[in-house]
């Protein structure tokens, strides 16, 4: 039998009311000094880790005792988490720091069912918690007594800037058809299973060089800022059954790798190009957010492409580091990430139960922690219509050496499910007290799990997206849909106008339409002769600054040329290029370049039977 030893640290609690103080969070007009009392339950003789899996702190707020329960956010980092920075001479330096014993926690206030908390315990307690419907912040005081903390309401923090702050996404609500509520959607069983399946977003955050200067080249401060934001991001997205794992951060310590300017739409486009061309080749991830300290144009503090999750270029966002408060920047990042997940701004008809809404176009002065009914319905509709594939891939989870914690919403070693604490669990398949499946059940989540049982073999769980894709069906032996496969590369498609390549049917005409609109078509051969010169933007291959002209047989694998509508007696060769991304405007790999021939990775037009 395990004996439990209660260890109490810092027994005294001396509340003190202050009128005004300058803290890391800003100027605070009214605050309370508290000395949190930490109570830890440890097995007798057990070695105490640096940061325990669960902790409790007792202190007083407004003279009333509260108990803050904390549980380590074990899924904060992926197993292959990495950090990249650059030496003064521009060399890329990537490290894989140990992150198992980190100090970031989620939590709740005892006897307050609606409470939440996002706390860093790295050097004292720093973060925020919700108590009786109000947002409080806590942070250590820099006093000789290191246990002293300030607790204060968010409303008592002096606003840094009274000017309105807004998201850069623009839309005209009146132009949209009314959104069907989730209850009105006529879902098939397969669609309902997909919605119920837990989703995962593998996130990379890039800090630009202005961030480096703002934090005086203190990479620890930048990392701490990012970790705190993602910890809060995770808490917010529980509402959508989405787990966010930080797989990497990149700090542009030497110089910006793109031209970061105040025009947010331009910067976002450049960042997306860089992500597709550079970052994705180096680091597997689903979404990347650029955290910048530049002052974006006008009231804009963030921008993202709506409905772009998993897209190589557009699954990105830009977030301005606009506040001293971690929570305000985290809420902005949650807002932009929601755009990637197909969610637009809330209209007047949207409801958050009397609380500020995350998807308000204008930033609320009080941190918004809730998605509206409109946001939920739009997100569900986006998932059903688009099925972004990357968010079903479970990230590699850091191998935790400490025991699993039942009730932290994260399935760890030895657990079969984890639906939170018994008071919050709404999963009929899972025993919240043991984190084991209930007797007679086979599963609790997955595209091939229905009413706690494996779906029958042969039931379609992923429809084919095109004639080059393959529909997948449940095996009857697993809750997971089989790996997404597609037709063999080189199979004819679109009435022999193209050949399948990685599940798609790339053609020159379709690429012209994507660049120039529905009236665009591929240009005559005479335009492609420009690729034979190997000058300027017209070539087949590029190695650093050296360009190589196309051989005559390869000219339709270099720069793409299009025409817009009827040409008459004059041919106007249209092409596009980008200084920041040399691949923009080039013919896609796998595109048909002649009968029985396709463009390979060396931009050569080769026999389709030997290309793959």
UniProtKB/Swiss-Prot annotation:
Its EC number is 3.4.24.-. GO terms for biological process: proteolysis. Residues 21-189 form a propeptide. Glycans are attached at residue 218. Expressed by the venom gland. It is found in: Secreted. The keyword Cell membrane does not apply. This is Zinc metalloproteinase-disintegrin-like 2d. The lineage of its organism: Eukaryota, Metazoa, Chordata, Craniata, Vertebrata.
């Amino acid at each position: 039998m395990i004996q439990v030893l209660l260890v109490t640290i810092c027994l005294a609690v001396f509340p003190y009311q202050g009128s005004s103080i300058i803290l890391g969070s800003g100027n605070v007009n009214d605050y309370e000094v508290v000395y949190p009392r930490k109570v830890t339950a440890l097995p007798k003789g057990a070695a105490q880790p640096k940061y325990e899996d669960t902790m409790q702190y007792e202190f007083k707020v407004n003279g009333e005792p509260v108990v803050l329960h904390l549980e380590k956010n074990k899924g904060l980092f992926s197993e292959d988490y990495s950090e990249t920075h650059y030496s003064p001479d521009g060399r890329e330096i990537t490290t894989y720091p140990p992150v198992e014993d980190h100090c970031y926690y989620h939590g709740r206030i005892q006897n307050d069912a609606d409470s939440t908390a996002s706390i860093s315990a790295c050097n004292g307690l720093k973060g925020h918690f919700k108590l009786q419907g109000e947002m409080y912040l806590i942070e250590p005081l820099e006093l000789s007594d290191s246990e002293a903390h300030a607790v204060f309401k968010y409303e008592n923090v002096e606003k840094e800037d009274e000017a309105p702050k807004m998201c850069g996404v623009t839309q005209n609500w009146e132009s949209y058809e009314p959104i069907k509520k989730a209850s009105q959607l006529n879902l098939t069983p397969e669609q309902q299973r997909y919605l119920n399946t837990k989703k995962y977003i593998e996130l990379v955050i890039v800090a630009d060089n202005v961030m480096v200067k703002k934090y005086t080249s203190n990479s620890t401060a930048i990392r701490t800022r990012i970790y705190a934001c993602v910890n809060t991001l995770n808490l917010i997205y529980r509402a959508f059954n989405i787990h966010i794992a930080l797989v990497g951060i990149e700090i542009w310590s030497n110089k910006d790798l793109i031209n970061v300017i105040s025009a947010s739409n331009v910067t976002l486009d450049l960042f997306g190009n860089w992500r597709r061309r550079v970052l994705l080749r180096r680091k597997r991830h689903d979404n990347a957010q650029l955290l910048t300290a530049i002052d974006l144009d006008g009231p804009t503090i963030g921008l993202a492409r709506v409905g772009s999750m998993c897209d190589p270029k557009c699954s990105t966002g830009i977030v301005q580091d606009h506040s001293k408060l971690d929570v305000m920047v985290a809420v902005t990042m949650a807002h932009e990430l929601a755009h990637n997940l197909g969610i637009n701004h809330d209209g007047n008809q949207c409801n958050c139960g009397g609380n500020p809404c995350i998807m308000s176009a204008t930033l609320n002065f009080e941190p918004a922690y809730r998605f509206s009914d409109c946001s939920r319905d739009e997100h569900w509709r986006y998932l059903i219509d688009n099925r972004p594939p990357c968010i079903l891939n479970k990230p590699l989870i850091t191998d935790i050496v400490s025991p699993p914690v039942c009730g932290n919403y994260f399935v760890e070693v030895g657990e079969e499910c984890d639906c939170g604490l018994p008071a919050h669990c709404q999963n009929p398949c899972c025993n919240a007290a043991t984190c084991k499946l209930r007797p007679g059940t086979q599963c609790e989540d997955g595209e091939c799990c229905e009413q706690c049982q494996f779906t029958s073999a042969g039931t379609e769980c992923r429809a084919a997206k095109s004639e080059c894709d393959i529909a997948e069906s449940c095996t009857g032996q697993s809750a997971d849909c089989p790996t997404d496969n597609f037709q063999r590369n080189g199979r004819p498609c679109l009435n022999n106008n193209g050949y399948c390549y990685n599940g798609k049917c790339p053609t020159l005409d379709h690429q012209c339409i994507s660049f120039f609109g529905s009236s665009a078509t591929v240009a005559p051969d005479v335009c492609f002769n420009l690729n034979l010169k190997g000058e300027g933007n017209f070539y087949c291959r590029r190695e650093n600054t050296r360009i190589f002209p196309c051989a005559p047989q390869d000219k339709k694998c270099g720069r793409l040329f299009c025409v817009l509508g009827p040409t008459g007696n004059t041919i106007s060769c249209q092409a596009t290029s980008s200084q920041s991304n040399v691949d923009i405007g080039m013919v896609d790999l796998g595109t048909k370049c002649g009968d029985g021939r396709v463009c390979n990775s060396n931009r050569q037009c080769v026999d389709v039977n030997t290309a793959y």
